[in-house]
Amino acid sequence: EVRLQLQWVTQAQFAGYYVALKKGYYSDEDLDVTILPGGPDIAPPQVLAGGGADAMLNWMPSALAAREKGLPVVNIAQPFKSSGLMLTCWKDTGIKSPSDFKGKTIGVWFYGNEYPFLSWMSQEGISTDGGKDGITVLRQGFNVDPLLQRQADCISTMTYNEYGQVLDAGVSEDELVTFKYEDQGVATLEDGMYVLE
């Protein structure tokens, strides 16, 4: 028996795991797999540490943070080789490049997801403490509301999820500018499979 804790709600990101279950690939290998959906109130490292799962999917920065706090996690598989993380910004804010972030409010996911962003801003020499020469960091929930409600000039999005939610809300691609972390040289590995040592 193997209980796999997803890091987020059931969506296309995890399709391969569900297809393998449906097609019997796990049972062909004598594995009885239960897939546990994640969500905004579920921290996969805590579920793994508490014995609620045998394996978890997690981003590397979050897994490294958990390991630094004493949870002996190890990566046993890395299905995603590139990052889908990006910032999605309103074009009418005048943002054309990262240097234009100064004086703006940017929504950032936390719980280990903030590290690539902080690394990026450090490389750009932009303070994350606010002010006209820095940026104001908004602790973004796992939704697109701060952008749609104009609480933030930019928000964290995934190419395969939240960006589509912004478009589905009636926003045109012409109204947006995006910055993929891969293109900025600060992307980290996502969706690794981790177990305890």
Predicted regions span which residues?
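Short beta-strand-to-loop elements that line the ligand-binding cleft
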Residues: 32-39, 57, 128-142, 177-180
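Short beta-strand and adjacent tight-turn residues that come in two discontinuous sequence segments
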Residues: 38, 57-58, 76-78, 108, ...
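Short, well-ordered beta-strand elements
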Residues: 1-10, 31-37, 103-107, 135-136
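Pocket-flanking alpha-helical
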Residues: 13-21, 36-74, 84-96, 114-120, ...
